[in-house]
Design a protein with these regions (language model features):
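M16/MPP (pitrilysin/insulinase) zinc-metallopeptidase core fold and M16-derived inactive scaffolds
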Residues: 99-133, 338, 342-369
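Short cationic amphipathic helices and targeting signals
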Residues: 4, 8-14, 136-140, 246-249
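Hydrophobic, mid-to-C-terminal alpha-helical segments
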Residues: 189-201
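A conserved hydrophobic secondary-structure block that centers on an alpha-helix together
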Residues: 1-8, 19, 365
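Proteolytic maturation boundary segments
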Residues: 9, 17-112, 171-175, 179-182, ...
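Short, flexible turn/loop "capping" segments at secondary-structure junctions
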Residues: 2-5, 126-133, 213, 315, ...
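Short beta-strand/turn micro-motifs at beta-sheet edges
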Residues: 1, 56-58, 121-127, 325-326
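M16/insulysin-pitrilysin zinc metalloprotease superfamily fold
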Residues: 22, 108, 126-186, 208-209, ...
Length: 369
């Protein structure tokens, strides 16, 4: 019913002898029998609607970290539409929505009193069911703080449903999406084989398009510029609603940790739904980090050294800082920088070393940083 030739495809990408590989595949697979005409076919799975939220709470003594997920289910876009411009436009609108909402959630997570350690929003496929999509909110919280985290993400979801996004948020998201598209096009000749495989696999299994890089760039840049904030807000209202919700909690089962019950989660949901919620206030400063015309005070170069083997240039500055520069052609329009200072684990005693090595993990789990 499932594993049979008419449901299978072989995708090969790489520096190969095409004829030899094709003949090898035919030799290996041609003996697989074709199913009988009356053989059972796989069923199309349809997930039923639900008016009241479905809530699942999973706790385990070995569970690491507390997490709550909120799914708002919806039918998937019909497969025959995935290969049309409408399908690509649908994806771009989703990208706008998730980019703007994730920026809001990140802004909250950076506050000293943030109700979660981290949170995110997604939109699209859910699990392995091709007929089902969902808008998803997820929050990771300190142990025992799931109720606060759930109230926060439900409030943010309700805020988007009621008020949508601002023009300022949209413009920043547009710049971000354009940069992503430009970067993908600039690196079109450096794509890995796995990227091609995934594109062809999606075309076979989901009927998504597989355009060349030039066509993809032209289409995506056109759609990114064509879509406006009203279209995104309209889409958000269509995919965020009180029915078809699923809430999933995963948390440690330990003494002293109190996790919310299903009844408590429903009460939080009801509280937020009936609350007066203010629209998002966009206070982002549009000024550049370094104003144009600013003269930066640097440190003069005292020594220059070349390493022909590594292809690097090392500058030693008057203040003692060493700068190593290596030009590459790996990726177009990309500059990577990192800075390292002496200290850290190297200044700890042998007895303190292992505790110091574990400290970042403890900090992360405790909500620091």
């Amino acid at each position: 019913q499932w594993y049979r030739p008419d449901y299978q495809a072989v995708i090969v990408v790489g520096d190969i002898d095409v004829d030899a590989v094709e003949n090898k595949i035919k030799t290996l697979m041609s003996d697989i029998p074709v199913p009988a005409a009356d053989a059972a076919r796989k069923e199309t799975i349809t997930v039923p609607d639900n008016e009241d939220p479905i809530i699942s709470i999973y706790t385990d003594p070995e569970m690491q970290g507390s997490k709550i997920q909120l799914f708002v289910k919806r039918p998937a876009l019909p497969a025959q539409m995935n290969n049309l411009i409408y399908g690509e436009m649908f994806d771009v609108i989703q990208a706008y929505m998730t980019t703007m909402e994730n920026a809001r959630l990140q802004e909250i997570s950076m506050k000293p009193d943030a109700p979660f350690l981290g949170a995110g929003m997604g939109s699209g496929e859910i699990g392995v069911i091709p007929t089902l999509n969902a808008t998803t909110f997820v929050a990771m919280t300190q142990d025992g703080k799931l109720a606060e985290g759930f109230e926060a993400i439900y409030t943010e979801m309700e805020k988007v449903r009621r008020y949508g996004f601002t023009q300022g948020e949209f413009e920043r998201a547009q710049n971000d999406l354009m940069r992503r598209a430009e970067r993908a096009y600039a690196n079109r000749n450096d794509r890995r084989n796995g990227e091609f495989v995934q594109t062809y696999l999606n075309n076979y299994s989901k009927n998504t398009p597989m355009p060349d890089a030039e066509t993809e760039w032209q289409l995506d840049s056109m759609l990114i510029k064509m879509i406006n904030v009203e279209a995104v807000n309209g889409f958000a209202q269509q995919v965020i609603y009180p029915r078809n919700q699923v809430i999933v909690v995963t948390a440690p089962e330990k003494e002293g940790i109190v996790n919310p019950t299903a009844e408590e989660l429903l009460a939080i949901r009801e509280k937020v739904a009936n609350a007066e919620i203010e629209a998002y206030e966009d206070n982002t400063v549009k000024e550049p980090l370094i104003p144009e015309g600013t003269v930066l005070k640097g440190s003069p170069v005292k020594k220059t050294a070349q390493d022909a083997t590594l292809g690097t240039t090392e500058w030693t500055l008057a203040n003692g800082v060493k700068v190593v520069v290596k030009p590459t052609t790996y990726k177009a329009d990309e500059v990577r920088m990192s800075a390292v200072a002496k200290g850290g684990l190297s200044i700890l005693s042998d007895e303190e070393f292992y505790m110091g090595e574990m400290m970042p993990a403890f900090n992360s789990m405790s909500g620091v940083g």
